[in-house]
Amino acid sequence: LQYLTQEEPKITVKPLKTKYPQGAERQVIYVTTGRKIYSKMLPADAGCVVDNVQTVLAVYDAVCKCTPSMTRVMTLTGDAMAQPQNYKVRFGMSHAELLEEAGGLVEEGAEKIISGGPMMGFGIFDLNVPTTKTSSALLCLTHDDVADSQPSACINCGRCVEVCPGRVVPKLL
């Protein structure tokens, strides 16, 4: 993208480190501009607009090609996925059909399938549920991935709740 946009004075591509969480709007603004967006602020208050690549593509298709948004790219990943990768998916396709077209699950199958990411996603218990424009990923986990957690150094102080940029409460996961 840097190469493709090098002649565009109003576009800057800034590659980011693979780090979680870094995809949420407030984190993207902070890491790219250094501007903090406080709880009662909107990105526009900091002079920023953050658009998802999928949204930008849908707007382009609608405005320039006069075509409705009927597909999106979904990431199918996790140790239970036979062929983890990104797939172009038509809205309404069931998760079962999607998994089948994507090569299915590994032999031992999936213990848990999450729609979305590991922190903010939700469990899928019926694979006949259709994909929608908000479907972004399927995380397919093996038994080992979701096995009971081992004792850890956590002392249940709650500090993680105070500092989590995604406002996640780990004890509720």
Q: Which residues make up each language-model segment?
A:
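Hydrophobic alpha-helical positions that pack around
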Residues: 2-95, 101-106, 117
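Active-site gating/interface segments in enzymes
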Residues: 28-32, 104-161
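Short acidic (Asp/Glu) and glycine-rich catalytic loops that position anionic groups and cofactors
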Residues: 78-79, 154-155, 170
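Short, surface-exposed loop/turn motifs that are enriched in glycine and acidic residues
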Residues: 84-88, 150, 162-163
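Iron-sulfur cluster-binding cysteine motifs and their immediate structural context
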Residues: 159-173
